Amino acid sequence: MRRYSPPYYSPPRRGYGGRGRSPPPPPPRRGYGGGGGGGGRRGSSHGSLLVRNIPLDCRPEELREPFERFGPVRDVYIPRDYYSGQPRGFAFVEFVDAYDAGEAQRSMNRRSFAGREITVVVASESRKRPEEMRVKTRTRSREPSGSRDRSHGRSRSRSISRSRSPRRPSDSRSRYRSRSYSPAPRRRGGPPRGEEDENYSRRSYSPGYEGAAAAAPDRDRNGDNEIREKPGYEAEDRRRGGRAVSRSPSGSRSRSVEVSPR
């Protein structure tokens, strides 16, 4: 016969439940005005309220009086401008209990105070010290100059990039093609362009081109681009000794010795 063994019972862990202890409170709900301090935003558990649109000549004692009806108030702080010393038109009211702060927020929001309609919301943070407010105002005053420098640098870089940008290659290419491939006007009365270029290439690449170029001032050219000698050369050669120099059309010299009868 098997013995009956009761199920194993694990003792509760410390800090969560157990004898004589209550479970932990639920997390606060999101939004304004929930249980336990009026919302689950950061800093709502400290019981600080932000009061906007208060008169500039309002004193902390005057603002403390209507809020003390909901519970004990720890502090009332009215921020002032660091340079001018004038109030900035809003205040922080900090309660001892966060629940009292939630009740005051629901009751005092959109109420009339000193002839003005005030707005009461749960502060996202506790009130700042004067040193923190001083640093914040300095950073705000420096922002416009920095933004101007950034915008100036941006416009300068854009102008430099525009000035350094090359021209469009398509336009230059089209202009070059229009100039290089346009046919030249045909001359009247002369030989065609192709024949003249062919004759020029024959003359320029002939072996005796250098000699022909040296004697170019003393030669005449006819219509068929043939080079002929002037009559003065033959008479002069006969006087010198009967030697006649005949020149070929290609520009090379060939000497023939003629013996005159004596």
Curated annotation (Swiss-Prot):
Bias kind Gly residues: ranges: 31-42
Biased composition (Low complexity): 1-14, 243-262
Compartment(s) where it occurs, according to its Swiss-Prot or TrEMBL record: Nucleus speckle
GO BP field: mRNA splicing, via spliceosome; RNA splicing
Record Pfam families: RRM_1
PANTHER family: TRANSFORMER-2 SEX-DETERMINING PROTEIN-RELATED
Name recorded for this polypeptide: Serine/arginine-rich SC35-like splicing factor SCL30
Lineage, highest ranks first: Eukaryota, Viridiplantae, Streptophyta, Embryophyta, Tracheophyta
Gene, per the UniProt record: SCL30
